Amino acid sequence: MNWCELFSSNYVMRLATHTPMYTPAQYLLSRRKLSIFKGADIKLLCGTNALYTNMLRPLPTWNINYLNCGMAAGTVCLGVGAGANSSSVNFYTRALYRKVLSHDVVHSVRDERTKHLLERVGLRAWNTGCPTLWGLTPEHCETIAHTKGDEVVFTLTSYHPNPRKDRAMIDVLRRSYSRLYFWPQTIDDLGYLQSLGAADGVEIVTPSLAGFREVLDRGVDYVGNRLHGGIFALQRKRRAIIVAIDYRAREMAKDYSLPLVERDSIETDLADLVESSWPTRIHGLDVDLIEKWKAQFDVDKP
């Protein structure tokens, strides 16, 4: 059972978190539409780094402030994560979260650190893990291969480059696999691959989710430093190794036993992990707690 049932029988509005809630002119021109949002039965916030310890920052991922967030009051976190850009939660951020986030339900967060953040500002939260993991049941993971295949699709992260380590990763994959595919998740990833001088013989996958799904469904393995690229591969029942380049992957691997190798240890650890046999087992997901969280919303009712 996955998170999709929260939406299956309901009218859903989608608003981007990275753009401001609205301007006064937009409210005058689109008051009816915005009123539907303001009066929604449930407002769900999703996002890896939707929250931060200090919301007094330029271009916050959830682009709200204390003056314009009233329309989003009562928002409920769904598998939300938090970034740390200060040593503690300041007064402004605490006041903002207490104003905009619901006090009536328990929030769903993806890791213990985010749970503690919300608890520090006086809100209730359960660590349900990222909703993308909810379908990775023991029965699902049993269908994932224990040993490597002949082909692999890999990813890179252009905004977090490490040319020496990323070349080393590709070199390991060339030695272990007969055919390499590269999926550019964002617009600059292909240029980064080419800048490494490592694109020869690599087949480029269409830069869309459909393209990624298509190559995974051919039965290839996944190796790369795109966290959710790896999780998506697991959802498609493909063997996956995530290369950790930031705290998001490390936190989720620590809590849920995702198959992971540190980028700093690529040269020593990746080849052994690729070549060895191991089962995919996602630990730490509390299925009963997830069902308890969903039960707050009467999800079976249209």
Q: Residue locations for each model-derived region?
A:
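Active-site anion-handling motifs in enzyme catalytic cores
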Residues: M1-P302
